[in-house]
Amino acid sequence: MSSSSYNPYKNNVNDRLINNSTDSFQDNDQGIPNNNDTFLSRIFGLNSIYNQLQDNYQYYDPEFDSSLNQQLQQSIQENDEAEDESLLPQHQQQQQQAAPMDLSIQDKSAKQKSKSSSLLNSDSDSDLSSSEDSYVRPNIPQIPSTPIETENQGSSSKIKFSIPQRAKNFVGKLHPHHEPTLPVYQTPQEFRRNLPQQQRASATVNTNYQRTRNNNRRFIIPPKERALYLWANITNMDEFLSDVYYYYRGRGLLNIVLSRGFDLIILIFILIFTVFLKWGIDYSIFFDNLHQEESKHITLNDMIIPNYFATIPLSIKFILFGFSVYILLRSVQLYLDYNYKLKELKNFYHYLLDVTDDELMTISWKTIVEKLMLLKDYNSLTSTTKSNNFSENHYVNDLSSKVRLNAHDIANRIMRRENYMIALINKDILDLSVLFMNEKSLLTKTLEWNLKLCIDNFIYNQQGQINGKILKEYNRNQLARELTSRFKLAAIINLILSPFIVIYFVLLYFFRYFNEYKSNPASILGLRQYTPYAEWKLREYNELSHLFNKRLIMSMGPANTYIDQFPKGFLVVNLMRLINFISGSILAVLVIMGILLEDENHSFWSFEITDGRSALFYISIFGTIWAITASSATGTSHESTISTTSQSSNSNSNSNAASTFVYDPEASLRYVAQFTHYLPSSWNKKLHTIQVKNEFCQLYCLKIIIIINEILSSVLTPFILWFKISHNSGNIIDFYREYSIHVDGLGYVCYFAMFNFEEKDKNMMSDLNKSKKRRKRMKNKMNKYGKTKMVNPISGKTVNSEIEMTKISKSESERSSDDESGNEQDYDNDEELDYLSYKKDDKMIKSYMYFLESYGGSKQPQPQPPQQQQHPQNQNQTVGGLRNRNPIQSIDPAIMTGNYYDQQSLNSSIYNINYKFDDSGLLQDETMNSSSRKKGGVLGMLNQFYKQDINR
C-alpha cells in the first residue's frame, strides 16, 4: 500500500498539523476541550478504554476492503504502466510547468514504487520478514489540486500518475474487460479517455469505494491482512498496548466475552431475585397456615402474588430503571468490543504473534513482549528503518521522535497511570484519615474508583498523556480549584447513590459468600486478604497486575504462618475454649437424641425446644458456634506450642516430628518480605514484637473486616471526598508537575518509573552524598590523630585513638540512620558502605531489580524456608561477593533491608537474589543509539550506576 492508501474511516487527526516541538504540542493540547467525557458518562462506562472505539484501527468493513487472488493481481500489475500512459493525451507535451503540485509529488513517489511493497498486498500466508521499506505508512494529508491550463505548451517529459494498487485492483475487478480505470486524484477532464456514458455516470458516483449493487459478490479481507493493517495503522500506542495486555489477562476472546456476559447475568439475577423475594411472595399465607389447627397443603405457586410488579414502590422502580440503563449500556459496550476490538486482537495474536487462545493460558508475558518487539519495523511509529523520503511526515501523537518499543517502555505505557497512583500512595500525598480510622482501612475499592474517576480524567488527555496545563506552574491554583470542584461533585453523587450502593454490596457479598460460610464457617472469619491500601503500597513500579498478583498469592501462606505464631491473648483463647466446649456438648446431646428418638410417628428434628424454634434450628446454631470457636481455640499461645513440642519430643515414635514447627516470627517475617518486598526501616530490631505484627495485620487484614470496610466506605466516601481529599488538590497538582519527566519516544511518565538514577535531587542520592561527606570528614580526623594513645575522659583509661574514632563514627552515623550503624561494623572500605547506603530502603531500586528479574534475569531459585538458617561465616562469604561484583550479579540480603549486623543469624530478607541478567535483547531499543545511551535508557542507567565498580 502506498503512503496515500485509502482508509474507509478516515482519521480526523490526520487533518491536523503535526507539531514537531513538544512544547507546542502541549500548548495546542490545552486549547482542545474534552467535551466527550463527562462525570456521569464515566460512571456508566460510556467512555471507558474499551468503549472509546476510535477511528484509528477499530472499524473494518469487509464490503469495502477486498483481497483478490494471485492471478488477478498479476494480470493487473502487468498492465499498470499501460494504464497510466493511457490516461494522458499524446499531443500535449508541455503541461508539466502548469501541472498541480500533487501531480509532481506523485511523480516522485512513482519513482520509488518498485521499492515499496504493501503488507496488505502480500499473500495471506506470507512471512513477516519482508524488506525494510515494506511497512505501511500512515496517510499523508492530501494537497488539493487546481485546474490545469488548457494551453498547449511544449515539454519533453510526460506527466505520470501513480495510482494506488488497491484502487487499481478494485476498479479492475469491477471492470473485467480492462476498460480504462479512473485515477483516484482529481485530474482535468481532458486527461481522461472518452468513456461510455454508462461508465462515466458510474464513475462520478463511485469515488470512495462506495458500495455498488452491480456486483453481487462479497469481498472479505483475510484475517492476516486485517491484522497487518491493524498494526500498521496504529496511532495511539498506549491504548493498543493496553488492549493487548487486557486480551492476554483475559486469556482469549471466548473467556473475556463469557466472563463479562456472566457478570451481567449475575447482576440481573440479583435484582430480579431480590425484588421477587420482597414483593412477589405473600408470606402471610404461609404463617397463617402454620397457626391453623387444620393446615392445608400449599405450594410456592399459591404464595406468588399475581402482577406483583405493579405493587413495587415508585422509588424502587426508579432504581431498577437506572440499573436497566446501566445493564443495557454494558451490553452494547460488550457487543462493540467483541465486534470491533476483541476479534481484531484475536487476529493480531494468532497471525502476527503466532499465539492462539489456548496457548494464552500458559504462555508468559515475557514471550509476548519479545514477539511484539519483532514487529517494530512493520509500524511507522516504531520502525527504526531510515527513510530517504524527506517529504514524508509520520503521524506522531505525543512526541517528535520515534515511538520506543522495548520491555521497559511497554510496561511504562501500560502502567502510565498506575505508576502515578503507586507514587501517590507511597509518598503519602493523600490524607484519608478520619477520626479513629486510618488511611489503611479507609482506602477501599469504592474510594479508589472515585479517585481514579476524578483524577485520571482531569490529569490525562484523550491520548493518555499528561495534560499540558498540569505542567505549567502558573496554572496551579486554577487547576487546584477545578480539581476540588470535581471531588465535591463526586461527593454529592456518592451521597445520593450511597443507599443503593450499600444495598447492592450487602446482597452481592451475601449471595457470594453464603455457600462458603455454610460449608466452612471458620473460613470466612479466619480468612485474610491484602487490603486495597496494601496492594498499592506493595506494588512495584512498572509491575504488571499478573506479576503482582502472583507475588501476593505466594506470600499468603508464609504470612498466615507468621501471624499464627503470636499468642491471641489469654482471655480470648480461654473464652473461646469455654464457648467451644459448651456449644459442642449441647450439639452432641441434640444430635444423639435426634438419632434415638426418630420413628415413624414422631420426629425429634421438628420438636419445638422453644416457641416456634425446633431442635433442627438449635442444632444449626450451636454447630456454627462450635465450628467458629474450634479454629480459634486451636490457635494457642507460644507456651502451649512449646509444651506440645516438648511432649512430642519425649516420645520415641518420631524424634524429628517435634522440630517441624519453630517459633521464630522474625525469620518468618523476613521470609514473607521476600515476596512482599516490604520491610521498612522502622521495623528494624522489632520484627518479633506485637507492634510490628499489628502493623502488618493492617496490611494483611481479615476478609470479613475488609467487607465491612467496603460497605461502610459507601457511606463515608462522600465525606472523605468533600472534607479530606478536596483539601489535597494542590498537593496532587504539585505532585504530577514535579514528578513527571518527558522521555523521547515515550512521552510524559512518572519519574520513579523510569529508573533514572542519574537524578540526584529527588530523594535518590542525597543520603548517599551526605554519608560520603561524613565518612570523609571522619577519615580525615583519623588520619590527623593517627594511632596515638589518648585518655578516655569518661573511663579514665588509655585507649587507641583509632578505636575511639571508630566509635565516634558509629555514634554519629546512628544519629542519621540506624541501618548504617550495623553496616559500618562489617565492611572495611568506604566503597562498600556507599553501595549499601545507596540501596537503603529505596522502592525505586527494588522495582528496578524486580523488573530485571521478571523480564530478563535467570531463573531465580525459590526462597528458602526460614527454618534453614546459616551461620554468620556463611553470610560473610555471600557478602564477600560484593567486592568483586559485576552489574547486578550478587545482592546480599542486608543490602535491601539496610541493617546487616542485625541479620547475621538469618539468611532471609526482602531479596535473596542472584541476578545474572543480560538485557541486551529485551531492554535494548535500537532508537537509542550513539551518544544517547550514555545519558538515558536502561543500559545507560546500568553503566552510570555501576561505572565506579567496573573501573575499580
Swiss-Prot record:
One record GO biological process: cytoplasm to vacuole targeting by the Cvt pathway
Gene Ontology cellular-component terms listed: autophagosome; cytoplasmic vesicle membrane; endoplasmic reticulum membrane; Golgi membrane; membrane; phagophore assembly site; phagophore assembly site membrane
Bilayer-crossing regions: 261-281, 309-329, 578-598, 615-635
Residue numbers on the Lumenal membrane side: 282-308, 599-614
Catalysis performed (reactions): a 1,2-diacyl-sn-glycero-3-phosphocholine(in) = a 1,2-diacyl-sn-glycero-3-phosphocholine(out); a 1,2-diacyl-sn-glycero-3-phospho-L-serine(in) = a 1,2-diacyl-sn-glycero-3-phospho-L-serine(out); a 1,2-diacyl-sn-glycero-3-phosphoethanolamine(in) = a 1,2-diacyl-sn-glycero-3-phosphoethanolamine(out); a 1,2-diacyl-sn-glycero-3-phospho-(1D-myo-inositol-3-phosphate)(in) = a 1,2-diacyl-sn-glycero-3-phospho-(1D-myo-inositol-3-phosphate)(out)
Start and end residues of each stretch annotated as Disordered: 1-33, 69-159, 806-832, 855-889
Membrane protein topology class: Multi-pass membrane protein
Protein name: Autophagy-related protein 9
Gene name as annotated: ATG9
